């Protein structure tokens, strides 16, 4: 089974957690694109979706899935999204696709976070994948200096503008032993919109695409 086939298997497996007549929170990325394809098969059974990015919104609209503004929705039963890394505590690094802020907002609203990945995303310690931080453009140099003090190597992601009009700094060479603490520390830096650590609000259910099929992990 190829990596993309494992992503597809995980994406389709998430369909079992979608309730009829509900509004579904939908994330961003290659694995989520498979989930969106799956969700389209039951678009007449759900009310619609809330999207975490312009890219996912476009794909869902093209498939005929109604997309709602989060401000018009009081609750979401599930949020389905991928991860760049996830550990055994269900802490994640997300934001490789630069949609981390909106992803974090939608995840905060949802009752249940379903994380869908292929088995290459499971790690013991977070940090091999660079940690993305969304930053107000004028604060770029200041935030980078503060990240160096925390032990990271900040790199400006050239040519990347988020859906919110901000920039991304990717932090390399950090072994993240205490994800919740670091998430809070980075979010406390003036000029940071948010960072790609999802530890305060981690995943509730993990669906892992493997060569043997989809494995379900709960914490």
UniProtKB/Swiss-Prot annotation:
Pathway: Carbohydrate degradation; pentose phosphate pathway; D-ribose 5-phosphate from D-ribulose 5-phosphate (non-oxidative stage): step 1/1. InterPro entries: NagB/RpiA_transferase-like (IPR037171), Ribose5P_isomerase_typA_subgr (IPR020672), Ribose5P_isomerase_type_A (IPR004788). Its EC number is 5.3.1.6. The keyword Isomerase applies. The active site is at 103 (proton acceptor). It catalyses: aldehydo-D-ribose 5-phosphate = D-ribulose 5-phosphate. One of its GO terms (biological process) is pentose-phosphate shunt, non-oxidative branch. Homodimer. Belongs to the ribose 5-phosphate isomerase family. This is Ribose-5-phosphate isomerase A. The gene is rpiA.
């Amino acid at each position: 089974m190829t990596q993309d086939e494992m992503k597809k298997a995980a994406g389709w497996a998430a369909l079992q957690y979608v309730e009829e007549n509900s509004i579904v929170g939908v994330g961003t990325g290659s694995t989520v694109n498979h989930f969106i394809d799956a969700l389209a098969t039951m678009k007449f059974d759900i009310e619609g979706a809330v999207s975490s990015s312009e890219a996912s919104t476009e794909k869902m609209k093209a498939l005929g899935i109604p997309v709602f503004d989060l401000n018009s929705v009081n609750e979401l039963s599930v949020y389905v999204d991928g991860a760049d890394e996830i550990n055994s505590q269900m802490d994640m690094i997300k934001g490789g696709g630069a949609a981390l802020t909106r992803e974090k907002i939608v995840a905060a609203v949802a009752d249940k976070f379903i994380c869908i990945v292929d088995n290459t995303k499971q790690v013991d310690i977070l940090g091999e994948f660079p940690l993305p931080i969304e930053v107000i453009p004028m604060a770029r140099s200041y935030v980078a200096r503060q990240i160096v003090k925390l032990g990271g190597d900040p790199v400006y992601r050239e040519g990347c503008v988020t859906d919110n009009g901000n920039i991304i700094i990717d932090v390399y060479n950090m072994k993240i032993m205490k994800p919740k603490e670091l998430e809070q520390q980075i979010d406390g830096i003036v000029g940071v919109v948010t960072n790609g650590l999802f530890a305060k609000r981690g995943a509730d259910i993990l669906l892992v695409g493997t060569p043997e099929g989809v494995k379900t992990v709960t914490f």
